[in-house]
Amino acid sequence: MDLLWILPSLWLLLLGGPACLKTQEHPSCPGPRELEASKVVLLPSCPGAPGSPGEKGAPGPQGPPGPPGKMGPKGEPGDPVNLLRCQEGPRNCRELLSQGATLSGWYHLCLPEGRALPVFCDMDTEGGGWLVFQRRQDGSVDFFRSWSSYRAGFGNQESEFWLGNENLHQLTLQGNWELRVELEDFNGNRTFAHYATFRLLGEVDHYQLALGKFSEGTAGDSLSLHSGRPFTTYDADHDSSNSNCAVIVHGAWWYASCYRSNLNGRYAVSEAAAHKYGIDWASGRGVGHPYRRVRMMLR
């Protein structure tokens, strides 16, 4: 009987039994024990090697936002020298051109009041140094706007814009400025009109247009009629008509009763889609025959 118990135990011993490894949890494997009564050798097993890590679980839901932090300390006052520097900076695009800025693009000019103003300078046309204050080209910007909008200026630097009546007033307070109007029809034909001087009075005078003599241009003169006229928008009627010209023709301009030019009028995407009143220059294509592209610029 004792032999029957011993043989299986020896068989396990010959097979080597479970492998024993030293780990931190089990620094050594327990040795074999022998039971005196039965002479049976017991081979205790050791803990196996740790398995490989399982896959990372999915992230849990986002927790609620924390409470707002405390308000930071008050910042230091700005440097008043910046105002002085702007007062000493360039006042027009021609001055920038003389300083070596030969590429057309957006620059900063200093207004007489000391404020920096971003403007587009055309450094290529007719000797360069032109400040573009109005541009129409694709109808992406609505020009049927309020008095306050025309006062401040609006639009997109990459497409269409109006620089702003107050900015034009500040710019033309000093020096002599000439005006160039450029027009392009839907067939790509380009014309222009040139005026000796241009100035815009202040808001107290409703941004009245003070225009010099028409000097030259293939487009003819369609702006002299508007010289001496205040600016009119749909919510500020200063024209000489019994009605509001801005409302009638869907624009904003130095209307009389009503116009020979209307370069802030409604945009037409094609000749076939022309409106009764649009971007017109009467001495050019006539009223009701709008232009596809327009630029107004000063130097």
Swiss-Prot record:
It comes from Homo sapiens. The keyword Calcium applies. InterPro entries: Fibrinogen-like_C (IPR036056), Fibrinogen_a/b/g_C_1 (IPR014716), Fibrinogen_a/b/g_C_dom (IPR002181), Fibrinogen_C-term_domain (IPR050373), Fibrinogen_CS (IPR020837). The lineage of its organism: Eukaryota, Metazoa, Chordata, Craniata, Vertebrata. Residues 61-70 have a biased composition (Pro residues). Gene3D superfamilies: Gamma Fibrinogen, chain A, domain 1, Gamma-fibrinogen Carboxyl Terminal Fragment, domain 2. One of its GO terms (biological process) is recognition of apoptotic cell. It is linked to Ficolin 3 deficiency: A disorder characterized by immunodeficiency, recurrent infections, brain abscesses and recurrent warts on the fingers. Affected individuals have normal levels of lymphocytes, normal T-cell responses, and normal antibodies, but a selective deficient antibody response to pneumococcal polysaccharide vaccine. This is Ficolin-3. The modification Hydroxyproline is found at residues 50, 53, 59, 65, 68, 77. Pfam families: Fibrinogen_C. It is found in: Secreted.
